[in-house]
Amino acid sequence: MWHAENCDLCGDCLVRCQYVDYDRVKAVQQIKQLMAGKPAEILELCITCVACNEYCPTAANPFDLINRLQEVHKSLPIPEKSRKFMDAGGTMPSALIKGDDSKPALSMCVMEPFISNDAVGGRMFEDMTVVKGGEYFCYLGYVHIGMDSPLIENARGFIDKLAGIEAKEIVFFHPDCYAMISKMPDYGIEVPFKAIHIIEYMRNYLKAHSDEVVPLNRKIAYQRPCASRYSGEIETILDEMFDLIGVERVARKYDRESAQCCGSLFSRIYPDRIKPMMEANVEDASKAGAEAMVFLCPLCMGALARPAGEKGMKPVLLSQLARMALGELPFPA
């Protein structure tokens, strides 16, 4: 939620934006226009990476204002195909597969069609109750097509459906779902279960079963997804997980707070702007000495797997990497 009372017009959010070249005067001018509800230039140039929320030193959440006004002013030239893709999320076939009630449940959102069969399995996910499909769709992806209202309209149904599992704890495989949960206080909705980020769940499992872990001794580049901007506290947990499995997260330009969006959607909308940045992101990972490019979001992997492979880096989902450390999967040759 946008907190106008927190904004001191410092301009940091847009000065640090990697997708525009604003000095502080221009940045402040843009924020003032946004605060007045005007169709500021940034509404069209923003690629919805959410980074400005993380950059803001006063927790004003400028992206939330930008995103709301993108919808009001219809600022983004979203292809009809992309809108239909998003709308299809809520209509996908759903399933609830009962498991051991003493374990947390696992929500897959609508990600199952976008991952390989070995991404979820083995001892770490054994006997968990699993829910998946449109009935458990989180709707957060709509922010990437410049829309905020679908989140608000579907928030209650999202929580109610998950509550119907009657699980005390739910692990969210898709980072967007965990991000959506973080928005519930803004919507005045109580969450009647403990939400667990997939990274926290895997870290906890690996820590509890450290005697089963075989250090991988690999260097990887991590592609931080846009949804992680809503849950910055997970970064230290991820670093701990990498330490547990003997993986070095290479230091590079486009990581952590300076991570770039994968470009999956906006490379189609603004190819001249975004494709060179995607190439720079992958090149950055390669030059840092990464043997693999590791993804949390399956859609990020879909966008960057091929260019990463062309640079000699194996594309790997984070859950696959954890299973490799448990000896359940081989590190790709």
Positions of predicted regions on the chain:
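Short cysteine clusters
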Residues: 7-13, 17, 46-52, 56, ...
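Iron-sulfur (Fe-S) cluster-binding segments and ferredoxin-like electron-carrier domains
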Residues: 15-32, 55-72, 267-285, 303-313
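Conserved beta-strand elements of the Class I
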Residues: 105, 221, 292-294
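Cofactor-cradling patches in redox/metallo enzymes
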Residues: 119-121, 128-193, 229-230, 236, ...
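Catalytic cores of enzyme domains
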Residues: 196-201, 211-212, 217-232, 245-248, ...
